[in-house]
Amino acid sequence: KDIPWKIYPNHPDLSVEQEVAEYNACATNAFGEWRFEDVCLDFQPDIVVDIRDFWMMEFEQRSPFRRMFHWAIMPTVDAYPQNEQWLETFCKADSVFAYYEFGKSVLEKETGGQINTVGVASPSAASCYKQVANKTQHRNSMGIDPDSVIIGTVMRNQRRKLYPDLFKSFRQILEKTQKTNLFLYCHTSYPDIGWDIPRLLTENGI
């Protein structure tokens, strides 16, 4: 479709062997490292905004064009202490946003106030993110039993995520309650670099 802005695809052309080899040469190329300098040269951005984890964005700080753009980041900070290398990189950003007050306070405390935190991102005001007025009607419209109980999780399929424990625990809940209206909803990606989800589901009889 026609869009009013430039788009720079990151995935290699699978018909070009050299391009595929270059892409596969470094794991962080999946996050755009191999394209970043070319995009900077072509687009010449004044501001680069990145809302991802440290390892998905740190190459931007090492760019030879770093002094040419304002670097605004919003890293995931959900625990402490933070890795010192991460903190050093975050401190080099021109402006840093946090997801919530906890992350902001961790960054400020662990960097001794050397980081330029500019605020906490507000939750979306879009109507689609508001709680539905009638859950029964909403579930019926989606073809879901209104009496069902849905347990949900949102996380990438990575080895550090405890998917095996999650599925094992859900199986235990099913056996303990003997309820047939319990559902586990995983908002995730597959395949990814993590667990073999179909195998885990089969092993746990889910």
Where are each of the predicted segments found?
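Extended catalytic core of nucleotide-activated donor transferases of GT-like folds
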Residues: 3-92, 101-102
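Nucleotide-activated donor-binding/catalytic signature segment of Leloir-type glycosyltransferases, i.e.
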Residues: 64-66, 194-206
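Donor nucleotide-sugar binding/catalytic pocket of nucleotide-sugar-dependent glycosyltransferases
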Residues: 92-134
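Nucleotide-sugar donor-binding and catalytic loop/hinge architecture
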Residues: 131-150, 174-179
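Conserved donor-binding/catalytic core segment of Leloir-type glycosyltransferases
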Residues: 145-161, 167, 184-186
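A conserved amphipathic alpha-helix that caps or lines the catalytic cleft of carbohydrate-
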Residues: 170-174, 201
